[in-house]
């Protein structure tokens, strides 16, 4: 079985959030561009202070709090340890999540895959 890409996971999460009437935004701080265009885009993002480490999603939960999700691809357990492709959470991403978790009525989580993100949302909504 092929593990979905991070973009495929993001599409699933976006569709689920829309279908369940959540107010949210996907922070577009990642993209693939040709090298020359990417260099110009990176300079523009830096001038605008767009953090490449900020969580991917900001969701207004139905109970009135905020949830930030850093979405990573699922872990592929079918590969050997040497061949395992894991989407690593950077030190800066962890720092962002820790900072956001210090704000009242706000929670930030790293989720490996759409299913984990959905479970996290439903769990937080239930408490």
Q: Language-model segments: which ranges?
A:
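Catalytic phosphate/metal-binding cores of nucleic-acid and nucleotide-processing enzymes, i.e., regions
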Residues: 1-127
């Amino acid at each position: 079985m092929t593990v979905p890409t991070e973009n495929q996971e993001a599409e699933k999460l976006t569709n689920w959030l829309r279908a369940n009437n959540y107010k949210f935004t996907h922070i577009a701080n990642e993209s693939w561009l040709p090298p020359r265009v990417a260099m110009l885009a990176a300079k523009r993002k830096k001038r605008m202070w767009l953090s490449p480490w900020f969580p991917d999603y900001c969701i207004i939960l139905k109970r009135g709090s905020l949830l930030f999700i850093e979405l990573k691809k699922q872990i592929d357990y079918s590969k050997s340890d040497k061949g395992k492709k894991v989407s690593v959470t950077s030190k800066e991403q962890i720092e962002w999540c820790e900072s956001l978790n210090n704000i009242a009525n706000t929670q930030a989580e790293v989720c490996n895959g759409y299913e984990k993100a959905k479970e996290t949302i439903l769990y937080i909504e239930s408490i």
